[in-house]
């Protein structure tokens, strides 16, 4: 039977599962993640070209540990087990797993067998640095398997049954700390499974537009446009699919950055002729936030108010049947995946869902994509770099960067300071080098001297961080002369500020945003 050109990853709770999917997609092959307790018939119906078993925090020796349906090892497709996945394969196929006294966490030196297909083309395979994260270990491999690699503390760090195209690794090839990890994954996908690199964003755009046309038919669609890359890409895709039957609603909550509304909406209306209605609700939001200092209350008030405003505007539209959202694949995974200890590190502070009584069907064009793939789609659609590479901006906007009470005066101080930070990062070439860089207005004043006069004015904090996925972050080592220019300009150009400080904390223990 001919199998489809895709890889299915079964998630056993590893924090690295999404990395596996991303590595495979980066190689040009479509991959999907499914929870380990998925109905095996669903996997059979998907007809994958290969199967990967992820790692996980559990022990196969525990009674309540997640298990693999044995029939999935009999599909006749190549299988790769990683960490916990290796131990599951060992257990299910007649080998033996034991609790290890010599646990391995972090880097280890791996000695691999160069004759094993998944290690082909790796020059240093006999002395490879790999990333381990396990307590149990394989003590006896199943019949028909051979040892393909060892470390100083474990004799079975990799195994293979090349006849049945079954492979297993005790280490994590998907993480950046493992040398040649991408080569190992690519060898499995291409040399073992024989899959083709046919997953491209150009083919996605073409297929997505056709699917949206078919699903929506002659109906109308409403979309909440935030100006971020996700909702912008959704808007352009849908506009190409259904034209003027897409109705975009942009809610100006008064908590946006300087000129944000004009820049984003102006571009989209001019170049893509989008049907955008701007709703000026700044006064309403600021009135709701008056006297509120608690960050969680700010978030909830902003979220509820946004829903009320959007609902009112959407309800006024006639014959709208669909609500479009910028849901991404990580959101889908989070809602469906096996809920192990890795499930939630921090709740998102983006504005929440819309009321169920809107009675609209959902359209989610990006639900198959990771964030980096959305950017590639944006390039395919001809969006400019100022939109594609816009740094993340929280749903509550500047409300969680103005610490303490929010007033129009304090918002304006922050807007001016933040604009200077953005200008200097762009001018120095650092904007694209960092994950996020922004200003924060602190809820205190300090004494200063300007000329011969004593001042007692506001403090601005600079928060500039490096990250890959926002789950962890470190402060960016931006050159001092750039920081000095930011500080000097803010103090001299922003009325009411006499001090600038730099936040040099990492996440964890701190978060990227201050509130």
From Swiss-Prot:
Q: In which pathway does it act?
A: Purine metabolism; GMP biosynthesis; GMP from XMP (L-Gln route): step 1/1
List the GO cellular component terms. Answer: cytosol
Q: What are its E.C. numbers? A: 6.3.5.2
The UniProt keywords, alphabetically, are: ATP-binding, Glutamine amidotransferase, GMP biosynthesis, Ligase, Nucleotide-binding, Purine biosynthesis
* Domain (GMPS ATP-PPase) ranges: 199-390
Enzyme class at the top of the EC tree? ligase
**Catalysed reactions, as listed in the record:** XMP + L-glutamine + ATP + H2O = GMP + L-glutamate + AMP + diphosphate + 2 H(+)
| Glutamine amidotransferase type-1 domain span | 6-198
Q: What InterPro entries does the entry give? A: Class_I_gatase-like, GATASE, GMP_synth_C, GMP_synth_GATase, GMP_synthase, GMPS_ATP_PPase_dom, NAD/GMP_synthase, Rossmann-like_a/b/a_fold
Active-site residues, Swiss-Prot/TrEMBL = 83 (nucleophile), 172, 174
Gene3D superfamilies in alphabetical order: 3.30.300.10, 3.40.50.880, HUPs
Matching entries from Pfam families are given as: GATase, GMP_synt_C, NAD_synthase
For ATP, which residues are the binding ones?
A: 226-232
Q: What does this protein do?
A: Catalyzes the synthesis of GMP from XMP.
Q: Which PANTHER family match?
A: GMP SYNTHASE [GLUTAMINE-HYDROLYZING], GMP SYNTHASE-RELATED
How does the annotation summarize its subunit structure? Homodimer.
The protein, known as:
GMP synthase [glutamine-hydrolyzing]
Q: Which organism is it from?
A: Maridesulfovibrio salexigens (strain ATCC 14822 / DSM 2638 / NCIMB 8403 / VKM B-1763) (Desulfovibrio salexigens)
Q: Which gene encodes it?
A: guaA
């Amino acid at each position: 039977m001919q199998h489809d050109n895709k890889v299915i990853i079964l998630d056993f709770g590893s924090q690295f599962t999404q990395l596996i999917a991303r590595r495979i997609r980066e190689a040009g092959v479509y991959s999907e993640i499914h929870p380990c307790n998925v109905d095996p018939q669903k996997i059979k119906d998907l007809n994958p070209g290969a199967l990967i078993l992820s790692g996980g925090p559990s022990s196969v020796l525990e009674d309540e540990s997640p298990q693999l349906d044995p029939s999935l090892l009999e599909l006749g497709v190549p299988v790769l087990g990683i960490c916990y996945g290796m131990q599951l394969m060992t257990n299910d196929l007649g080998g033996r797993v034991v609790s290890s006294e010599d646990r391995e966490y972090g880097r280890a030196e791996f000695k691999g067998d160069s004759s094993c297909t998944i290690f082909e083309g790796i020059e240093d395979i006999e002395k490879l640095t790999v990333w381990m994260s396990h307590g149990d270990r394989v003590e006896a491999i199943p019949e028909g398997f051979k040892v393909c690699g060892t470390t100083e503390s474990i004799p079975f760090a990799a195994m293979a049954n090349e006849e049945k195209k079954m492979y297993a690794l005790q280490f994590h090839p998907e993480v950046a700390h493992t040398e040649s990890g991408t080569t190992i994954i690519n060898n499995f996908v291409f040399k073992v499974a024989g899959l083709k690199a046919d997953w491209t964003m150009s083919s996605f755009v073409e297929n997505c537009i056709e699917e949206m046309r078919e699903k929506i038919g002659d109906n109308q669609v409403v979309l909440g446009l935030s100006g971020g890359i996700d909702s912008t890409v959704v808007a352009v895709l849908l506009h190409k699919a259904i034209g003027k039957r897409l109705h975009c609603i942009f809610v100006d909550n008064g908590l946006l950055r300087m000129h944000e509304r004009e820049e984003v909406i102006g571009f989209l209306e001019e170049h893509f002729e989008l049907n955008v209605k701007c709703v000026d609700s700044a006064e309403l939001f600021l009135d709701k936030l008056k006297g509120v200092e608690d960050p969680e209350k700010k978030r909830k008030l902003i979220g509820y108010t946004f829903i009320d405003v959007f609902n009112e505007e959407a309800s006024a539209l006639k014959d709208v049947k669909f609500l479009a959202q910028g849901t991404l694949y990580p959101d889908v995974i989070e809602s469906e995946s096996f809920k192990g200890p890795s499930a939630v590190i921090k709740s998102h502070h983006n504005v929440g869902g819309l009321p169920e009584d809107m009675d609209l069907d959902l359209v989610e064009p990006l639900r198959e994509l990771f964030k980096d793939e959305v950017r590639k789609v944006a390039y395919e659609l001809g969006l400019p770099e100022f939109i594609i590479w816009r740094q993340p901006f929280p749903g509550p906007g500047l409300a969680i960067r103005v610490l303490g009470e929010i007033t129009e005066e304090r918002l304006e101080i922050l807007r001016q300071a933040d604009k200077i930070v953005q200008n200097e990062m762009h001018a120095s070439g650092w904007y694209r080098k960092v994950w996020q860089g922004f200003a924060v207005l602190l809820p205190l004043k300090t004494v200063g001297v300007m000329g011969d006069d004593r001042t007692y004015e506001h403090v601005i904090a600079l928060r500039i961080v490096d990250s890959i996925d926002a789950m962890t972050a470190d402060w960016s080592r931006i050159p001092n002369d750039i920081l000095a220019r930011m500080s000097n300009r803010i103090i001299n150009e922003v009325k009411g500020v006499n001090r600038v400080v730099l936040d040099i904390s990492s996440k964890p223990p701190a978060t990227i945003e201050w509130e």
